């Protein structure tokens, strides 16, 4: 098995973890119903960009 030769420093650990942060989902308000939904996704009642797309 692979075993590290030397211990990694706190700085190297932090550099590795610098890309691990989670981002919040981008939310927007629907033009028709005023409902909050994720960007580029259909609302729960079937509207997308102000138009009914799911009957």
Swiss-Prot record:
Q: Which Pfam families match?
A: Ribosomal_L32p (PF01783)
Q: Name one GO cellular component term.
A: large ribosomal subunit
For this entry, list what GO says about its biological process.
translation
Molecular-function GO terms, alphabetical: structural constituent of ribosome
Annotated S-S bridges: none
Q: Which domain of life is it from?
A: Bacteria
Which key words are in the record?
A: Ribonucleoprotein, Ribosomal protein
HAMAP family with a match to the protein in the record: Ribosomal_bL32 (MF_00340)
PANTHER family assigned: 50S RIBOSOMAL PROTEIN L32 (PTHR35534), LARGE RIBOSOMAL SUBUNIT PROTEIN BL32 (PTHR35534:SF1)
The family note in this entry says:
Belongs to the bacterial ribosomal protein bL32 family.
Q: What is this protein called?
A: Large ribosomal subunit protein bL32
Task: Give the organism the record lists.
Answer: Aeromonas hydrophila subsp. hydrophila (strain ATCC 7966 / DSM 30187 / BCRC 13018 / CCUG 14551 / JCM 1027 / KCTC 2358 / NCIMB 9240 / NCTC 8049)
